[in-house]
Structure formats: C-alpha cells, structure tokens
Amino acid sequence: DFVMFSMHVHENRYAFQAYSQDHYPANYVRELAHELIDNGLDMYVGHGNHTMQGIEIYKGRPIFYNHGNFAVQRFGSDDSPPNSGNLTNIEANELRDSWLQQYINLVAFAARTHYEDGKLVEILIYPLDLGVDASKTPWSRSSIPQTPAPELAQRILAEVQRYSEPFGTRISIENNIGVIRIPPEETVVVGQDLKIPGRGPAAR
C-alpha cells in the first residue's frame, strides 16, 4: 500500500494565506508532516495557502508543503449573493479578489514522483502559469494552469529552489523542468504499515 496525506491549510509562518508574502509553512505543519512520516506515511501534500512553498525530502519521503494555486476559480456562480452597484458577478469578484491577480498567486507547479523497487529516486517539477501576463491571457483562460514561457518557467523553478533550500533540498533545472534526485542513502522503502499515534505500540 501507498499512504498519502493531504491537508488544506491557509497559514504560513506569519499570517493567514498570502498576505504576508511568506513562502514557508507554519511550524506545526512541518511538525505534523514529520510525525506522519515517522509513523509510516509515504507522501505529504499541502494546499490552501494560495502561494508556492518548498519541497522537503524527509527520511526519503517527499513533503510538498504547497504547490500554489494549481487551478483556482476566481469567478462567482449565478447564485452568488446580490451585489451593490449593479455589477455583474465577474466584475464584483474581480474587484473583491484582486489579491488573486498578484504574481505570487498566479504561479504554481505540478510534480511527478518516480519510484524504483519501492524507493523514491526522483521528483520532476513542472512550472505552471495561471495568467501572469494578463495582456496575453484570454479571460476564459485566466486562473487555468498552462505551460509557461521559458523565461517564466525558469523564474518559477528558481523560486521553488529558493523555497526548498532551507529544507536541504537540491533542485536542478533541466530543460525548464525541476529535478530532485534522491541519494541512495536517503531512500526508504514505501508501503510500510501506517502507525497512528495513540494506537498500540506507536503511542507516545
């Protein structure tokens, strides 16, 4: 079996969501990810903060603290509450959610993990553009992930590099794709039984 844990969390180190412009997880998030892996988890995936955060390899297992806004819906549905000024739902939402139009909320990444004989050996990181250049992005494609232009891809990957460095994660950039290679001494066989704290011998 392969055990993955996903958590929706808005906090970063200093504040709620992206308002502090911080790209690192709150301490309790990292502690939780480590404890879960200590008890048999194979992969941690966080989301909800709206901005990219780093990648950590802990005991040979990946921790994706936040991929960014992979696909975020910026426009309200027809049953949205009435708004003042006779604005359409799209107009009202664009004004109300202007923070979603900031650069940090319009870049993200997807990742693919590669295993051999049950061991993580490589992670590929694919940068995503959710409409950074509004002048070139049709309204209908806004906030929908697309392959970025080479220059933007390099910028996004360099940022993921920087956010991952404090965790000791080394990311190389090859043909506009980020690559993490796991040294043999860091690999751990996945699929071990998940030990839940508080149950049986795993209790602390």
Give the residues covered by each predicted segment.
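Conserved beta-sheet core of the metallophosphoesterase superfamily
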Residues: 23-109
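Beta-strand-turn-beta hairpins that frame and shape the catalytic cleft
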Residues: 1-3, 59-63, 118-121
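Conserved residues at the C-terminal ends of beta-strands
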Residues: 6, 47, 126
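Solvent-exposed coil/turn segments that connect beta secondary-structure elements
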Residues: 10, 68-70, 118, 128
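Short active-site-adjacent structural elements
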Residues: 14, 54, 73-74, 122, ...
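Short acidic, glycine-rich surface-loop motifs adjacent to enzyme active sites
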Residues: 1-20
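Intrinsic structural disorder
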Residues: 18-19, 27, 204
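A short C-terminal boundary segment appended to hydrolase-like catalytic domains
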Residues: 79-204
